[in-house]
């Protein structure tokens, strides 16, 4: 019964019309192009992002910070996300263009609970930023998120290294560059799909 309730309350990103970043990144790597990832906080921003990306025929990653998610409410964000996909299709049709792939991504999530909640409410990709933790703890937390996310075909971005400053409520006084040797171990032990690194 509890499993049935869990499935009933979960909204898959596929129901909202999003894709995960796995195939998106593979095509970009093969084609030699970059994919824009934009954080949005209001209707005007998301409209501008969708129109620009449709008209340039660019795949896009719509990013939501943990702060923006708290502000907007996760239920409302589902409808905003779904609306963005529908707007994309309508604008593409109006302009005689192809629909574009769109991903909905949690930017700088810092807990398993937040990542899980986003996965259950229609996000197709999540970032778990445990870079402020010791290396082994970062591996452990990232692996936990990856194991849950991959059950639902959601992609995960990890982070290694720290940039000084404040980004999405994550603050650091000093920069720590990413050690390439750590990257090999981190990716192998977490099975993460993509990785944010600190190179200056």
Predicted regions and their residues:
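Short, contiguous strand/loop micro-motifs
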Residues: 11-12, 36-37, 101-102, 132-133, ...
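A short N-terminal beta->alpha junction/helix N-cap motif
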Residues: 12, 33-41, 68-69
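A short helix-to-beta-strand connector/capping loop
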Residues: 33, 98-101, 152-154
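Aromatic/His-enriched, Gly/Pro-containing loop or helix-boundary segments
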Residues: 100, 104, 108
């Amino acid at each position: 019964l509890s499993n049935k309730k869990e499935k009933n309350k979960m909204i898959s990103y596929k129901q909202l019309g999003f894709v995960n970043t796995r195939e998106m990144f593979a095509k970009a790597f093969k084609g030699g192009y970059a994919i824009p990832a934009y954080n949005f906080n209001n209707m005007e921003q998301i409209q501008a992002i969708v129109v620009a990306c449709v008209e340039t025929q660019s795949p896009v990653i719509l990013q939501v910070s943990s702060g923006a998610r708290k502000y907007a409410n996760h239920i409302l964000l589902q409808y905003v996300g779904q609306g963005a996909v529908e707007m994309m299709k309508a604008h593409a049709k109006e302009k005689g263009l192809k629909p574009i792939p769109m991903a909905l991504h949690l930017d700088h999530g810092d807990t398993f609970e937040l990542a899980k909640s986003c996965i259950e409410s229609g996000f197709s990709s999540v970032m778990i930023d445990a870079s402020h933790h010791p290396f082994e703890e970062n591996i452990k937390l990232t692996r936990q998120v990856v194991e849950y996310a991959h059950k639902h075909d959601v992609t995960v971005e990890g982070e290694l290294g720290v940039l000084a400053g404040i980004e999405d409520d994550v603050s650091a006084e000093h920069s720590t560059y990413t050690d390439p040797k750590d990257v090999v171990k981190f990716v192998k032990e977490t099975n993460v799909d993509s990785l944010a690194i600190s190179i200056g």
